[in-house]
Amino acid sequence: MKIDVVRPWELTAFAVERWAALQTADPALESPFLSPHWARAVARAKGPSTGDRGLRVAVLGGVEDPKGFLAAQVGPFTAMPAGAPMCDYQGLVAEPGLEIDPREIVAALGVGRLDFCHMLEGQTAFAPHAKGAEPSRIIDVSGGYAAYETERRAAGVSALKDIDKKRRKVERELGPVTFTAFSRSKTDFDQLVEWKRKAWRETGQTDLFSAGWPLRLLRQLFASRDPDFGGVLFTLHIGETLAAAQLDIRGGATVHSWIIGHDSAFDRYSPGMMLFQDILRWMDTVPYSRLDLGSGDYRFKRELANAQVEVSHGFVGGLSAAAMMREAAYGLRRVAESLPLGPVSELPAKAMRRMDLLRGLR
């Protein structure tokens, strides 16, 4: 199959419309991270690239007759998902039934290997190359918040009831709780960024924003006025004080929970959970009906979610040193995880994720 590789801003208006139409036509591709607007936003944040390296879009069928699209960050020897590690989903957006060997895409990108870490289920071309999977949790409120709340309580989940109790308690003790959607407060945005950086410092994790482009990406999406794609800042104030905030990504009928934080001084009242509840109630008044929580085995995700999809990690590679090195790394990981070594068994997987994170931040 003919595959053209172009920079995101080189896509014609027709190609962008075609990409968006293919995504809209398939409910399984309902994610802002799979849209052409995501690829272009990441490209703007990263800045111009030279040569064959940088953010690229593989156009299956060619730019004159596009049948599918896959965005990737292309390096000297390997490629990664566009926007990694800031993207929560990856996948090929293509015509239904389109058959493609993903190794053709790897060859067209001019690399020896394409890694993925959150490949959506249903991506049949990539399924044989997956090395493992985990659930990614979703809240579907298409039937309205009241129906969702009833369903959760029937499932034996008390989280929403507990949030209501804490809301009444904080209003008695500290003052009114105020929810804002599409906040334009730069002060609140900056506070959310600081909360996130503080959390990374306290847990010994890498500050993703220190790489520069991830924070530029957040600022661009926060400032976006595009009705079809962009960021949305949700805030929750207790009295006059910002207690919790989320900068999420929106597209189609989905809001994807992305950057979240709260003031630890209000921990006893769970302001972050109150904010989730307010977002879900707000969805009754807007075209959005799905709050995507992403992957990660957190209690609040298990309790709030009423749907899930599988996301997989793995790689596609041909006969190359890059592919052989990755296969060897996964082999070591499998052996370690099969042994009863406790936390030591997880070290190879953690090392791989750490290296991928650093590669993505370049």
Predicted segments, located by residue:
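A conserved beta-strand-loop-helix scaffold within acyl/acetyltransferase catalytic domains
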Residues: I3-A79, M119-S136, E151-R268
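A structural micro-motif
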Residues: M1, V111-G112, G175-V177, S289
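Flexible, glycine/proline-enriched loop segments at strand-loop-helix junctions
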Residues: G91-E95, T150-A155
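Short C-terminal domain-edge/linker segments immediately following a structured domain
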Residues: L34, D101-P102, Y145-Y148, R167-R172, ...
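Acyl-donor binding region in acyl/amide transferases
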Residues: L55, L60-K67, Q73-S136, I249-V309, ...
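Short loop segments at secondary-structure junctions
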Residues: V63-E64, P96-G97, D140-G144, G239, ...
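Active-site/acyl-donor-binding loops of N-acyltransferases
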Residues: K2, Q123-A154, G252, V286-P348, ...
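Intrinsically disordered, low-complexity, positively biased terminal segments
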Residues: Y89-A125, F182-S183, G204, L208, ...
